[in-house]
Structures are given as structure tokens and as C-alpha cells.
Design a protein with these regions (language model features):
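Structured core elements
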Residues: 100, 123, 145, 169-171, ...
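Active-site beta-loop-alpha junctions enriched in small/polar residues
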Residues: 81-87, 106-107, 127-129, 147-151, ...
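Short acidic, glycine/serine/threonine-rich loops at helix termini
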Residues: 91, 114, 134-138, 155-158, ...
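Charged (often Lys/Glu-rich) extended helix/loop segments that serve as interaction or gating elements
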Residues: 283-452
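General structural feature for long, well-ordered alpha-helical segments within catalytic domains
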Residues: 38, 54-57, 61, 65, ...
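A charged N-terminal "starter" segment
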Residues: 1-146, 152-165, 204, 208, ...
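Conserved, mostly hydrophobic/aromatic
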Residues: 58, 83, 105, 137, ...
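Active-site loop/helix belt of alpha/beta enzymes
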Residues: 2-16, 176-319
Length: 452
């Protein structure tokens, strides 16, 4: 008979079919499969932890978003936000669905070109565009969204040297009733900065003003803020037409739509309270249609939606390392998933689901990662069934920003797989190895040898 591990007795309330703070029962069903592929098989073949992305979910989200806007507005174009998730397989899925590329660095610009996106369908945002970046953008006829006057002056000289007309827009920041304002980017609407930049562009021979851009925040919960922003950009566009007899081609509303994830501190779950893509679509399109644009002169509407389209398409699989009690008696579960690969655990209360059958007794639990840092907390308090060492878990809705902001701190970054429309599993990024990391390092000759 196998010897059982001893755990000191502790009187602790267990919950079984008891109401939670919302007056409903905390009920769990094991998440044993993703897109009909068994979690245990995925971990057995690809290791733990493991990111799993659903191609079907990406395509469904993209088509739902397009339908929401195109049913309300005649000219709509999405541009995939590379910074949200720039795995090539993810980007190319969005491009197959018709999305352009939206990038914020020279590195991301090169990635979009490498993904076979035409330069004319790359939107170049961000405050840090080097002169080489600008030259490349001008050469590829990209849409350059100017962030500040220094960039404007540099771009004018570069376009003049190249004897080309740079296609430009300006980023406009504004008061939409959401605070703090994102006024560090772009030109302010209220104090006249936007018009100052527009007047300069209209005087330059080597620039053509093709659009107006804004990005009012991140994880936005107020569709009305987008209605205000759309109205102010429409007023700017109409003012340009009146002053210069020049019609812009598009209004770019940026991104920032909230996903269905649960923000820390929220009383109710995001799936019940966060606005839908239809809510955002209605706010933006109704404002533009009811503005003073002639019906046959409505500008193209561009959306740079990222998080809302990718968050719920990916799961992170992991394994229980151990359980223990803190000094105050609280139960803790330690996973092989750290904040170094689940960066969004700093601002989300991610849903954690066991991947196998379990007892229906639950207990409030602190979920930690494997890092030797006290900040490595995946969930500060979550009601979970009792799990044992070696059990598997699924952390849901991890598609946005984790695969771009992760780092190899203490542990290496894991493999990423994508399940295609037919249920086939593809490795889209290999797990890191020490040899791969050492390829980038150099040791000075005098440090190569030592004795201890």
C-alpha cells in the first residue's frame, strides 16, 4: 500500500453548493478539451506550460466584428494591431480575413512586410519612428500617423529627399469624458494643437493628408466615449474641407475595445458587464452617419481592434506543482505558470479551470506561479476545487499582450500551438532553449575561464 503524505489537520470551511457573493452557486465543470483536442494530450506532446490558440475563434471573432460595423456603415476596414499579438500565424489569420496591419515600431513594420502585407496597407503609429523607419515607410507608401511636430518636420525632409508624397494622418487626443486622458500621444483637439499640425501639413508639398486618427485608451468600457471622439474627428474633417477644400479619405478610431476578461476590482464578471462589439459599432457609426458629411462622401472607417478580437481565442495550459498552507491558514496552489508568461495577471482576474474531474468541495485559494518573487501571483483569491500535484489547469482568455510582453525571467518561454479549423495542432512558436538564448550573448576573452 502506497504511503500517504501527511498534512497537518486544519479546521477550514469548505464550500459545496453554497451561494457566492452574487447569490448564485460557484459551479465548475472541468475543461478537458480545447477545440475537441484533449488537454492532457496537448500537454503530453508539447509540454507544460503551453499556449493554445484557436484559429476558429479568431476567424469567428473577426467576422462578427466586421458584421457589426458593416451592417451599420458602408465603408469599413480593420487593421490588425501587431503589438497585441504578433505571432505570424495569428497575424496571417487576420490578414486572410481582410485586415490590414497596424504597427508601432520599425520591428513591427518589418514583421508586417515579412507577412506579405503591402506597404500601402500598413498603418504606422507610435511616437518613436526613427529616420530610417520613416524612409522605409515613405518608400513603401505606408500610411504614416504623425505623433508630434519633431516627427512631422523629419518626415517632411525625408519625403522631400525621396521626391515622394508621404501619405499622412495626425493622431488627435481629446477629452472624451474618460480620465486620465491619453494626451501624451498626438495633438490635442481642445487647445488647437491639432489644427496647428494640420495647417503645417497642408502647406507642405511632399505630404498629402489622407486621414485623421485617434486612440482614446485601453480596455475602454464606455461606447459613448467613442461617440464623442468620432464626433470631434468628424468636425475636424469637415473643417479641413471648409478651409482647404480638401477631403480626407478615412477616419481611424484606433482600438481599445474591452474584451470579456475580468478587471481586478470589478464586482461583476466582464462577460456580463463589458460592452459588446455591437455597442461600440453603434456608438461610432451612428455618430459619423449623423454628422455633416454628405451621405455619398462618408470617409472610410478604420478600426485597429486588438484585445477584443484575440483575448478569448487563447488558453494557457499548466500543471499544479504543489499545495500548501500560508501562516494564516489560507490554501495556496502553486502552478508552473508565472507572471513572466502571464503578464495580464497583473490586471485581470483570469478564470482558472481544472482540466480533469475533481471533488465538488471548493475553497478560497491563492494561486502562485513558480518564480522566486513575491509578486508572482496569478490569482490573489479564487474559489477553486481541491487539486493535487500533477493535475492540469486551463487559464482562459490569454490571447492579448501575453505573447508580446512575456519574458524569460527565471523560466524559459514555452511553446505556442494553434488548432486549425479541422482540429489539427500546429506548433507556431517553439519553446526556448538555453542554446537559443546563448546565441545572442558574447563573453569577453578574459572572462572565459575561472576557478572556484
Amino acid at each position: 500500500m502506497e504511503k500517504q503524505r501527511y498534512e497537518r489537520p486544519l479546521i477550514k470551511k469548505l464550500e459545496s453548493n453554497m451561494p457566492n457573493k452574487f447569490g448564485t452557486r460557484t459551479e465548475y465543470l472541468p475543461m478537458t478539451h480545447i477545440e475537441n483536442v484533449a488537454v492532457k494530450d496537448l500537454i503530453k506532446e508539447h509540454g507544460s506550460p503551453l499556449f493554445v490558440i484557436s484559429e476558429r475563434a479568431i476567424r469567428n471573432n473577426m467576422r462578427k466584428a466586421k458584421k457589426a460595423f458593416e451592417n451599420r456603415y458602408p465603408k469599413v476596414q480593420f487593421a490588425w494591431s501587431y503589438k497585441t499579438n504578433y505571432m505570424d500565424a495569428v497575424c496571417r489569420t487576420f490578414h486572410q480575413e481582410g485586415s490590414w496591419a497596424e504597427v508601432v515600431s520599425g520591428f513591427e513594420f518589418d514583421k508586417a512586410l515579412n507577412n506579405q502585407v503591402e506597404g500601402s496597407k500598413i498603418i504606422f503609429n507610435g511616437p518613436d519612428k526613427s529616420e530610417d523607419d520613416l524612409r522605409k515607410a515613405v518608400a513603401h507608401n505606408a500610411l504614416i500617423h504623425i505623433d508630434h511636430l519633431d516627427e512631422l518636420y523629419s518626415l517632411q525632409e525625408i519625403a522631400k529627399e525621396a521626391n515622394k508624397k508621404a501619405r499622412v494622418a495626425i493622431r488627435v487626443n481629446m477629452d472624451t469624458g474618460i480620465y486620465p486622458m491619453w494626451d501624451r500621444f498626438g495633438f490635442n483637439y481642445e487647445n488647437g494643437q491639432a489644427w496647428d499640425a494640420l495647417n503645417k501639413i497642408m502647406r507642405y508639398e511632399n505630404m498629402v493628408l489622407v486621414g485623421l486618427h485617434t486612440h482614446i485608451g485601453t480596455f475602454m468600457l464606455s461606447p459613448n466615449a467613442y461617440a464623442i471622439a468620432a464626433g470631434k474627428l468628424a468636425d475636424l474633417a469637415i473643417g479641413i474641407k471648409d478651409k482647404y477644400q480638401h477631403e480626407i479619405q478615412y477616419i481611424d478610431m484606433g482600438g481599445g475595445f474591452a474584451s470579456k476578461n475580468n478587471l481586478k476590482g470589478s464586482f461583476l464578471p466582464g462577460i456580463d458587464t463589458n460592452p459588446t462589439i455591437d455597442d461600440f459599432a453603434e456608438a461610432i457609426t451612428s455618430t459619423l452617419i449623423n454628422s455633416n458629411f454628405p451621405p455619398d462622401k462618408l470617409p472610410l472607417l478604420i478600426l485597429e481592434t486588438g484585445r477584443a478580437l484575440i483575448d478569448d481565442t487563447a488558453n494557457l495550459l499548466g500543471t499544479v506543482i504543489s499545495n500548501k498552507r500560508l501562516s494564516d491558514g489560507r490554501r495556496t496552489t502553486i502552478l508552473d505558470i508565472g507572471v513572466n508568461i502571464l503578464f495580464t495577471s497583473f490586471w485581470y482576474d483570469h478564470k482558472i479551470t481544472p482540466a480533469q474531474a475533481f471533488t465538488h468541495h471548493t475553497e478560497d485559494t491563492v494561486v502562485y506561479g513558480p518564480l522566486c518573487m513575491n509578486i508572482d501571483v496569478i490569482r490573489e483569491n479564487v474559489n477553486l476545487p481541491l487539486m493535487n500535484k500533477g493535475d492540469h489547469v486551463v487559464i482562459q482568455s490569454v490571447g492579448a499582450y501575453n505573447m508580446t510582453q512575456w519574458m524569460q525571467f527565471i523560466t524559459l518561454r514555452p511553446r505556442i500551438v494553434m488548432i486549425d479549423m479541422e482540429g489539427n495542432v500546429h506548433v507556431i512558436r517553439e519553446s526556448e532553449t538555453l542554446d537559443r538564448l546563448l546565441e545572442l550573448e558574447r563573453v569577453p576573452k578574459h572572462l572565459e575561464k575561472f576557478e572556484l
